[in-house]
Amino acid sequence: MPNRQEGDRVAHGFPHRAAVGASLTALYRRLSPDGVYRYPVSVPAADVAFGDDEDLHLGTQRVARALVRHLRLPEARMVVSFRSMEHAAAVELAAGPEYFVELNDRFRTRRRDIGAALAHEITHVLLHRLGLGFPDTEENEILTDVVTAYLGAGWLLLDAYRQDGVESQKLGYLTPEEFGYVLAKRAAVFGEDPSPWFTSAVAYEAWGRGRAEADRERTPPPLAGAGWAERRRYGRDRRRGVAAPGAPYAFDGGAPATGVSFLCPVCRQRLRVPAGRPLRARCGVCRTVLECAGWGLPQAPSPPPRWLRARGVGGFRRPRARLRGGYGLSSVLRLLKK
């Protein structure tokens, strides 16, 4: 796991969007939805916290055992050591019954982040035993961060991100916003709110930005919860048979399009459904049932919201009150003032 301590080197935003989505899909494919649902509760903060007077080695082993239990790995002897190293931590993926984890020497004095480093490394063990991984090293590390967060231990990695006058640090391969994004995806499935667990102010802000991005992906067209402007744009694109650049969907079947594909908002698997009629689709990977609308039919678009109609938006003009004889309301008011 990388060890970044210079705040100006911390990347932000969502540069690994494709790898994060592929990691979520791979996790659901390997574990199945039933396997993912075996992790409904995140690791409690009390189980991974260090007491001021707690022995370093005994406390580290206690936290490691708590993470092993949380990730549903077999109970075994924990061997955790500290040494000078370039990275934050490393783990031995041997087939033996013990778990061998090495931590950077700096964690001797930064005990509150030991749980974050252990969470990433112990997830490596889980993925090794599941036979789940990507050929590319960086993508495999991103997969590890995503699985750590989605199975309920990754909030520790985001909370280890700090930028203040005393220290500046980030653990893991994902950006802070991407950690918040994956945590928000998990929160939407399990009804969990990790925000009370953050002790870092910048981590809380990154969680908010990631949650906003995850919320934006929950109801893209053709899903029924899309907003009025998105529906109107989708209908226009469907009649043309071509999606606009950057649109979260793609069409096929000519113009108007007869099929549309989009990413599942839960597992990011690409789905294809008939276009132009309302239907209910079930994702074959995560089994999420999605309500799809039938926008884009060759008919007049639905009227915009009332507040937009009042401004004459979308071709709808606010009607003026008229009286018989051709007098408008404004004319009558002027006559009454005389």
What spans do the regions from the language model cover?
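Active-site recognition of the HExxH zinc-binding catalytic motif
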Residues: 116-132, 149
